[in-house]
């Protein structure tokens, strides 16, 4: 890993991509400390503890990189965009016109991306209104109003600023994906979680529970090792290519393999599941009624309802995103088109069924592992009554995004080495 990073800095083009990515992430972190206009900073500082625990506000604050607790420009984080992406991907299965659009190549994907952006703006606007009223209800803890003037013009100004911040984050994420290294949206969440690491380490170090203090580092190391093992694990399907006559020349047949990863979906299912499970308690916090409080308590991040629900969604999204990433029918058609076949399996439909069966067997343990890693640290923190935000979901996202970014960096280096060879 270290050699890959050192080699990357020796290539001018990759060096520019890394610098661009770092610059965009720096802008994100700066925006996370810029308060929106019309906010009483003294009152905001007085309610910081409400966002420091392992409740739903602490979880939302974690994914916003601490911006929510400061009611900063990027307080919404990137969650509205992720929610919009989930909705559009699910609609592609249910709505025939969207399904047809998704199969029209780059033009269709560009249209779907545009719809995702529009939906993001709508969700961000609605969520901004909810957050303004949420902070207004927290004034009892602050002793004074968080919003300096709670009237329509000032509320509208704050809502517009928060919505603009979310749209700006969406734009930064897309820019990183296009001109930088790695997936921009994943890297923004990665930066948010990493920025909260010092607070998590301090909470662990100052805990009076000595058993928890000793166990936590070993648990984290075991989780990291397990994530790397599963993320890098793959089954290699042997592929044989027959001899082919091209013009007057006969090409030699060869043997290679088709790598099927244990966790082909990567860290996306975990991000999607966390986004879905954050929705009910967020609504419960915004609706200041007895029913709303019950919903918020029922889906508390440390409750077993939340853990079970998140685990189920992780398994579902792992299968769903694996199906989006790898299509056995298309893979079988490509093998048949170029004269390839799997020994002992007939080309065409039998090959597709074989790949689908193997992929299902690989995906199931991978999905269960992701769900277990997300749940176990959360259960441990809840049972030991520790006030630490960094649970299994956070560790999964950080390690998963780091591994995927390193793979993209290695792919960029390999591509540049081939270009140098051809020159």
Tell what function each PLM region has.
Residues 1-102, 107-423:
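N-terminal cationic and glycine-rich segments that engage phosphates or anionic surfaces
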């Amino acid at each position: 890993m270290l050699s890959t990073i050192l080699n990357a800095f020796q290539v001018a083009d990759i060096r520019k991509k890394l610098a661009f990515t770092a610059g965009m992430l720096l802008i994100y972190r700066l925006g996370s400390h810029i308060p929106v206009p019309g906010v009483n900073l003294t009152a905001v500082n007085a309610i910081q503890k409400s966002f420091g625990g392992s409740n739903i506000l602490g979880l939302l604050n974690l994914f916003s990189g601490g911006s929510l607790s400061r009611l900063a420009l990027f307080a919404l984080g990137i969650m509205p965009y992720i929610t919009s992406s989930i909705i559009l991907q699910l609609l592609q299965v249910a709505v025939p016109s969207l399904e047809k659009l998704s199969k029209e190549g780059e033009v269709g994907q560009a249209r779907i991306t545009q719809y995702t952006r529009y939906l993001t703006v709508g969700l961000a606007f609605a969520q901004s209104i909810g957050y303004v009223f949420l902070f207004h209800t927290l004034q009892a803890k602050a002793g004074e109003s968080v919003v300096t003037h709670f009237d329509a013009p000032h509320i509208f100004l704050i809502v517009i600023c928060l919505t603009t911040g979310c749209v700006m984050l969406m734009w930064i994420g897309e820019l990183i994906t296009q001109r930088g290294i790695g997936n921009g949206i994943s890297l923004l969440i990665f930066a948010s979680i990493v920025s909260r690491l010092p607070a998590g380490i301090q909470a662990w170090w100052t805990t009076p529970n000595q058993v928890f203090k000793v166990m936590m580092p070993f648990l984290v190391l075991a989780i990291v090792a397990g994530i790397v093992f599963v993320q890098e694990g793959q089954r290699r399907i042997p592929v044989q290519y027959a001899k082919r006559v091209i013009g007057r020349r006969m090409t030699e047949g060869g043997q290679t393999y088709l790598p099927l990863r244990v966790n082909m979906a990567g860290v996306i299912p975990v991000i999607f599941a966390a986004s879905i499970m954050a929705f009910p308690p967020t609504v419960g916090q915004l609706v200041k009624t007895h029913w709303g409080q019950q919903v918020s308590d029922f889906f508390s991040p440390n409750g077993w309802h939340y853990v079970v629900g998140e685990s189920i969604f992780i398994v579902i999204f792992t299968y769903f995103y694996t199906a989006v990433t790898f299509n056995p029918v298309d893979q079988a058609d490509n093998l048949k088109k170029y004269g390839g076949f799997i020994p002992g399996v007939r080309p065409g439909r039998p090959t597709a069924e074989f790949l689908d069966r193997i992929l299902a067997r690989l995906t199931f343990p991978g999905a269960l592992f992701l769900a277990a890693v997300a749940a176990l640290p959360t259960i441990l923190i809840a049972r030991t009554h520790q006030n630490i935000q960094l649970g299994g979901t956070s560790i999964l996202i950080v390690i998963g995004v780091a591994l995927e970014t390193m793979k993209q960096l290695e792919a960029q280096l390999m591509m540049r080495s081939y270009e140098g060879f051809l020159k």
